[in-house]
A protein has these predicted regions:
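Glycine-enriched loop-and-adjacent helix/strand subsegments that border the catalytic/binding cleft
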Residues: 17-54, 59-61
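A short, structure-level motif marking secondary-structure boundaries and short turns
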Residues: 41-42, 68-70, 104-106
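A generic structural signal for ordered alpha-helices
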Residues: 8, 12, 31-34, 38, ...
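Active-site-proximal loop/helix of nucleotide/amide-processing enzymes and allied scaffolds
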Residues: 1-16, 20, 73-158
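Histidine/lysine/aspartate-rich catalytic loop segments that bind and position anionic ligands
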Residues: 49-89
C-alpha cells in the first residue's frame, strides 16, 4: 500500500503574462537573463557547474526557467528526463535553450558538452521541442571580451 507523500515547496513564482515575458532571440539576451535570474537562484553555486534550461514559447519569449543540475568544479550530470520535464508540464513551450557555466572561466565547450547537446537535440526532436542553443557562460573579463560560447554559433546545434 502506498503511503501519502509529503512535499516541500522550495520556490514558487507567478508565471509571467505574455506582456511580461522577455524576448530571448540571441545568445547575448540569454546570457543577460542568466546573469539577472539564474545566478540569483538560491541553489546556484558559481564554484560548481550549474545547468539551467530556459523555456520559450513560439515567439521566443521566456515562459520560465529551471535549474536542472548542480555538479562539481568540472563535471555535471544531465539527463533528458529532467531537462524536458518542466517544459512538458507547464505546456506552451515550443523550444528550450540550454545553459551552463564553467567555473574555470573558460567558456570553450568540452567534448562532453558537445555530446550532451547532441543527445538533448535528439531527445527534443522526439517530443517536438526544439533545442535552439546551448550556451556556456564563463567569467567576465576586464577588457569586456565575450565571456560565453554559443554552440549554435560554433556549428554544433543543427
Amino acid at each position: 500500500m502506498n503511503q501519502p507523500q509529503e512535499y516541500k515547496v522550495v520556490s514558487l513564482r507567478e508565471c509571467p503574462t505574455p506582456a511580461e515575458m522577455q524576448l530571448c532571440d540571441t545568445p547575448d539576451k540569454a546570457v543577460s537573463y542568466w546573469r539577472s535570474h539564474i545566478v540569483n537562484h538560491p541553489y546556484f553555486n558559481p564554484e560548481c557547474e550549474c545547468f539551467a534550461v530556459l523555456l520559450l514559447n513560439t515567439r521566443r519569449r521566456i515562459k520560465g526557467h529551471q535549474l536542472v543540475s548542480i555538479g562539481t568544479l568540472d563535471t555535471l550530470l544531465v539527463h533528458p528526463r529532467e531537462v524536458f520535464r518542466l517544459a512538458i508540464m507547464i505546456g506552451g513551450v515550443s523550444a528550450i535553450l540550454l545553459m551552463h557555466n564553467h567555473p574555470s572561466g573558460d567558456a570553450a565547450p568540452s567534448e562532453a558538452d558537445i555530446k550532451v547537446t547532441h543527445d538533448l537535440i535528439r531527445a527534443g526532436q522526439l517530443i517536438k521541442i526544439d533545442v535552439l542553443d546551448h550556451i556556456i557562460v564563463g567569467q567576465p573579463t576586464p577588457d569586456g571580451a565575450r565571456d560565453f560560447a554559443s554552440l549554435r554559433e560554433l556549428g554544433y546545434c543543427s
